[in-house]
Amino acid sequence: MFQDLYRFLRTGGLKVYSLGQQDKICTDPFVFIYEAGTEDTSSSKNLKKESIELWVFYPFNEYSKVEDYIKQVENTIKKFGKLRKNYDKYAIEIDNDMKAYYTKLSYFRYVYREGGR
C-alpha cells in the first residue's frame, strides 16, 4: 500500500517523503508517510488492521495557510479511497529543528490475512 499511496499523493501535487528522506529545514509544505504497523482485529480472525500516519509539515511564518494545506491532504486521501480516517483533530505543533508547524493524520484499512479468505 505504501507505494500506491506515495505515488497517489505525488500525483495529487503533494511533496511526499518516507522515513529518512527529509531531515532539513522545511522550506515547502510536505507530507511524511509513516507505516504505523499492523494489529489483529477482534471481529474477525481473517482480517488485520494496517495503520498509516501522515505527518503534515508546513514552513514557519505561514501559519494562516496550515489549515488549508491539511484540508488539501485530507481531500487527496479521500480521493485515494483505500483508507479510513482514524483520528480526531490533532493539535498543530512546532518543530524548531525543521522550522515548521506539523500535525498528524492517522488512517487505516482492513486487509485479509494470507490464506484468510
Question: What are the residue ranges of the model-derived segments?
Answer:
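Small/polar-rich, solvent-exposed N-terminal microdomains that initiate assembly or binding
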Residues: M1-S44, D68-Q72, F80
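Short, charged, low-hydrophobicity "junction" segments
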Residues: Q3-L9, W55-F57, N86
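A generic structural signal for ordered secondary structure
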Residues: L14, S18, D28, W55-F60, ...
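Generic "edge-of-domain/loop-turn" microfeature
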Residues: T38-D40, N61, Y112-E114
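Short, solvent-exposed beta-strand/turn "edge" segments of beta-rich domains on protein surfaces
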Residues: T41-L47, N96-M98
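Oligomerization/assembly interface segments of phage tail-like spikes and tubes
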Residues: N46-F60, Y101-Y112
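Short, conserved charged micro-motifs
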Residues: N61-D68, G116
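Acidic-leaning, charged glycine-interspersed low-complexity segments
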Residues: K71-R117
